UniProtKB/Swiss-Prot annotation:
GO terms for molecular function: NADH dehydrogenase (ubiquinone) activity. GO terms for biological process: mitochondrial electron transport, NADH to ubiquinone; mitochondrial respiratory chain complex I assembly. The lineage of its organism: Eukaryota, Metazoa, Chordata, Craniata, Vertebrata. Core subunit of respiratory chain NADH dehydrogenase (Complex I) which is composed of 45 different subunits. The gene is MT-ND1. It is a multi-pass membrane protein. Keywords: Electron transport, Membrane, Mitochondrion, Mitochondrion inner membrane, NAD, Respiratory chain, Translocase, Transmembrane, Transmembrane helix, Transport, Ubiquinone. This is NADH-ubiquinone oxidoreductase chain 1. It comes from the Eukaryota.
Amino acid sequence: MFVINLLLYIIPILLAVAFLTLVERKDLGYMQFRKGPNIVGPYGLLQPVADGIKLFTKEPLRPLTSSFNMFIIAPILALTLARTIWTPLPMPHTLIDLNLGLLFILSLSGLSVYSILWSGWASNSKYALIGALRAVAQTISYEVTLAIILLSIMLINGSFTLKNLLITQENMWLIVSTWPLAMMWYISTLAETNRAPFDLTEGESELVSGFNVEYAAGPFAMFFLAEYANIIAMNAMTAILFLGSSLNHNFSQLSTLSFMLKTLFLTFMFLWIRASYPRFRYDQLMYLLWKNFLPLTLALCLWFISIPIALSCIPPQI
């Protein structure tokens, strides 16, 4: 039974990732006054299938000077972590119900740094290594902000369990009372997933393609799938943390539909931002975090710690 549940959990994510690539290309096309993919299948709907077949049937090439084991392990690790991060998410039911679900997600997002670093190091290429170092510095930096924002949310929630967030937000979404945190969280997730305008790892003018420049065929497709799975997972997290999930014990299907619509809207915002904004300069990216976001999140965290004490009350669910 567990194997069936696992398959029912993995296959929809892979399908969602495949069609997200199509949606992105279509959206960018219409925003630039063109059609996007429209040849393969009706309205281009079979384009992700064609892309997948093409990538996984090509010969996986690698540089002669690369470190073979690490070169192969890096994309497998990236895809595995991108799939595992979904396990504690309540949609509204989880695959594995963890008491420390938020810490689990935070630790997995930290581990994803290793796959990027290994890929850049194992490629034995200057472009790949510089792209990997950029990605690692960016990801580790923004994880500081994400961790403090999560701590603030947990102080309001009174628990590290994700399911309790659904109960906390029964009357009002947390985005109403904590909109500065929600804004900084959303911008930080853009940086965490290396998306525009923070896609400094893929600066075409100076780094060709970033840390995955030496990858082709299957291993490249794994990195691609991992990136888009992380995008959907981060938006699912945003929906759970700040937009609730409209928990309805009688009609769980409605809860799932509500969660899906919120995640779809947030993911569409990712694509809209990509079409609208130019790439940041690297020093501006770091300045935004260390000089703006970090002091603000620390101040707000202290605020949420002091409010219950000042009002002589305790958070719910303790």
